[in-house]
Amino acid sequence: MNRFFSLAIFILSSFVLLNVAFAQDETHGAFDVVYNQDTFTDENRSFILTMPTDFRSGWSEDNLGFSMKCLADGLNVLVIWGKFFGGDRDDRVAVTYRLDDRPSPGPMRWTMLPSSEAAWMPMHLVNDFVAEARTARTLALRVTDPLDGETITNTFSLEGFGTALDRIIPCR
């Protein structure tokens, strides 16, 4: 869990998660599971997180993180990076993904979080993505900042994805 500690803290702070009742960690394949429950509402705010397959040690601004997190609107798909991206006029970045050797659906606009160092997938795409990811072995992610064209690309192992995800859903 040490290799994910700083990224997990970043995700938690990005969502301004106050009043966390408990946090307990476990690992399934390439994924860490972090359990969080709001003290007052009992809402599930748990998440799973993985780092790129070529991740060595220490977080760098040239790495992406891949996460799925329970929020008030349900299960969210997130990509995290370690530097400021300007985004477009709607605070979005271009995200392209590819599962195994399947064709990529092409670049999509994902809305950035207020930190400008993470973005989430549009909710109407999440269920199809999850269904496809459950049967895949790898995920390639590319994030491009439309402001200046800066790009970060990483590949992730999806080993343990289904098991880890099943540990945090349903998101209630």
Predicted regions and their residues:
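Bacterial N-terminal signal peptides that target proteins for export
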Residues: 1-8
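Generic extreme N-terminus detector
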Residues: 5, 21-22
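Bacterial N-terminal signal peptides
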Residues: 8-17
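A generic "folded-domain core" signal
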Residues: 22-172
